[in-house]
């Protein structure tokens, strides 16, 4: 793991394995370690590149930044490591960034995997969930809030109680607010038809944050896209159905 200055910001980047590059982007409020459950096995086939996006994990945390900054950072990482073309995988917020990258530089994305995505939003899906259930979570800390709302996030709450860190954050309230603000008013729908990469869109059947209809919409708008629905997952298929998820990803990337 190394801190590297990209676009004037120190980003914490980890590279593992050999083969074709596969860049993975994590969720809102999270960090790259949450992707280890899939990045580690995938590193047997690919050179996996994970990083803490700006404002997250061990990367630098500016007071303000935008979704475009995240997009530029991915392209900056590719430039820094002389990666002309890559496989790109994004999860939740990471899928928003991945869509932006594939639109901005379609010639640089060989294959694209969008996990529990949406193509547009007034704010983050997590923030919307908090607002919808404001009375239910009133007075609760972040951990208590996640426990209360877990039934809206996943299919099997019993299994996911062992992986609560997927939805929790080590950001301060101010840092989390900045991360949410970066996702204000984005809409990729008119530009999705310009994506040229073969694309796999994966949604969880029981996802109340970014439901399958959001993934299906994206798959219809991207010319060379296929849609897969995880039957026993909510918003965390990489944890809820890890083996099935890896099989889908490996089959798609290795074919």
What name fits each language-model region?
Residues 195, 201-203:
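Short beta-strand/loop motif that positions the catalytic acidic residue
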Residues 206-210:
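Acidic catalytic loop of the alpha/beta-hydrolase fold
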């Amino acid at each position: 793991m190394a801190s590297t200055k990209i676009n004037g910001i120190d980003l914490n980047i980890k590279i593992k394995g050999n083969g074709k590059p596969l860049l993975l982007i994590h969720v809102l409020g999270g960090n790259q370690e949450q992707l280890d459950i899939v990045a580690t096995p995938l590193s047997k086939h690919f050179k996996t590149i994970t990083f803490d996006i700006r404002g997250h994990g061990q990367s630098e945390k500016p007071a303000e930044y935008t979704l475009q900054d995240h997009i530029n950072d991915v392209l900056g990482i590719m430039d820094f490591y002389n990666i002309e073309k890559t496989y790109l995988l994004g999860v939740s917020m990471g899928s928003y960034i991945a869509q932006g990258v594939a639109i901005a530089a379609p010639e640089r994305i060989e294959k694209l995997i969008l996990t529990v995505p949406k193509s547009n939003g007034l704010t983050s899906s997590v923030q919307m969930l908090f607002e919808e259930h404001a009375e239910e979570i009133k007075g609760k800390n972040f951990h208590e809030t996640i426990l209360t709302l877990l039934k809206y996030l996943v299919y099997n709450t019993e299994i996911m109680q062992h992986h609560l860190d997927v939805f929790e954050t080590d950001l301060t309230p101010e840092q989390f607010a900045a991360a949410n603000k970066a996702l204000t008013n984005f809409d990729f729908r008119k530009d999705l038809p310009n994506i040229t990469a073969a694309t796999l869109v994966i949604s969880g059947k029981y996802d109340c944050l970014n439901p399958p209809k959001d993934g299906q919409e994206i798959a219809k708008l991207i010319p060379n896209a296929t849609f897969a629905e995880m039957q026993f997952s909510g918003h965390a298929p990489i944890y809820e159905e890890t083996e099935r998820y890896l099989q889908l990803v490996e089959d798609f990337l290795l074919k």
